[in-house]
């Protein structure tokens, strides 16, 4: 359950980021001397919502995996491998953002993961299906973090095979 507590701790971080973004916009509006920073501030503002959504989906995944473990419900093995690949792509995306770059270079790997997610094994176990749905939403959110329009990001994730 420590993982769930860690996941919930991101709420405060998102609130701080949202406040910083709002403050940055306020400073831009009141000081023409800061206009040279407007692109960076606007990029930060545009990141807040999809980042918040991605973190919320991460919490759902963590919670449903914890429930599945508690109830001894099977989660397909392929999900663990897939989540490891998604974690790697997410780390790379975070590296781009830390380097103050838009993570456009991560769009193709995320799109590939979105396509692959439509082919993952299906199961009648609710927790597994919630994990799959949340991971697919998370990929769309990460595509939006990378700079893609949110509706376009959603379109990059094909329907689940056989669904």
Model-derived features: positions:
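Conserved catalytic-core motifs characterized by acidic clusters
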Residues: 22-40
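Low-complexity, proline/glycine- and charge-rich juxtamembrane/linker segments of membrane proteins
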Residues: 1-10, 37, 48, 67, ...
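Soluble C-terminal extramembrane regulatory/interaction domains of multi-pass membrane proteins
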Residues: 25, 41-163
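Non-transmembrane accessory domains of multi-pass membrane transporters/channels
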Residues: 1-27, 44
């Amino acid at each position: 359950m420590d993982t769930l507590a860690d996941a919930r701790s991101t709420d405060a971080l998102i609130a701080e980021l949202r406040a910083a973004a709002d403050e940055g916009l306020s400073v831009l509006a009141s000081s023409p001397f800061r206009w040279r920073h407007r692109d960076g501030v606007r990029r930060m503002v545009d990141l807040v919502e999809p980042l918040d959504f991605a973190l919320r989906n991460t919490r759902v995944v963590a919670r449903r995996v914890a429930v599945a473990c508690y109830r001894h419900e099977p989660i397909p093995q392929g999900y663990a491998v897939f989540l490891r690949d998604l974690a790697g792509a997410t780390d790379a995306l975070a590296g781009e953002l830390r380097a103050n770059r838009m993570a456009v270079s991560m769009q193709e790997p995320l799109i590939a993961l979105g396509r692959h997610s439509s082919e993952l094994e299906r199961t009648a176990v609710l927790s597994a299906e919630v994990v799959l749905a949340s991971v697919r939403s998370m990929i769309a959110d990460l595509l939006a973090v990378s700079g893609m329009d949110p509706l376009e990001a959603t379109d990059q994730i094909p329907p689940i095979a056989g669904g």
